[in-house]
Amino acid sequence: MEVGEELGPMSVAVDDHKIKAFAYAVDDYDPAYMVGRPGRERIGHPTLLCNDLFHVRKSKYDYTTGEAGLHAKQEYEFFNPVRLGQAITLTGRFVDKYIRREKTYITFEAEGTDEDGRLVNRARSTIMMGLRPGVMKEPAPAPAQEAKTEAPAVTIVSGPIVERASRSTPTGAQVKPVVKFINAGQVVIFTGTDRRSIHTDLQTARAAGLPDIIAQGLMSMTYISEALNDFFGKTWQQGGKISVAFIAPVYPGDIVTSSAIVREKVAEGRRQRLLLDVWSENAAGRRVTVGTASAPV
């Protein structure tokens, strides 16, 4: 894996099964995904292709042996909705590689385009490599049931909850939170069953020092995206951006609440762009995912 190395192309079919399986995995059954809204094309969840973009490395590398790498950071941009029946072409490239605290990190970018060459989405992923089963150097995270005994993190929220974004939305406004109960089936379906990993196989997870299979960090990102899709509407799918870091584990049985607060409003041509702080936290109040997001209004 060297900087500049190209990845792909790979093709992804956006069919009924893919849309509905993803809806189950992230517990988001918006009618726009399940049946389509009257007079409109049926679409998929905004983050429907997030795992496909993350695994564009499969075009060059076979990592079906259970290697337990850790996903550290994720950026995602939305340009156009993903529509039922499309064939999306994925391409990517490695853009950075570095060592920090004796661990190798690699960053790669990937994008999806439709049959007409229109950009649908773009992702930038950073992962910590080289954690094969049985050789995890860092202490294993506490099991989910133990995490619930920790003192909650302080979350300062003072503004009103605003259902829908507009040019008059004030700074400090809260986005309506999204609450999810995570089950093992969702974790496995989200990741896919084509390989054993710390997300799908208990034996592999325990060999890597984990107490249970662990949810992909991307799942928390999809929950935040759901909240922001409800808040912004179509401008989230056509101009939304999110950048998050995955800072604590999520296990089956956890309850995850995803929230956002409007931090700033900036001019963007004839429109404004709302900048938000975003995060997901477990039932103990421990943040598991943190970052920023924005979209035009």
Language model features with spans:
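HotDog/MaoC-like acyl-thioester-processing domains
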Residues: 73, 78-177, 246, 250-297
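Catalytic-pocket segment enriched in acidic/His residues
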Residues: 212, 219-265, 281-283
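Hot-dog-fold acyl-thioester-processing enzymes
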Residues: 1-73, 134-238
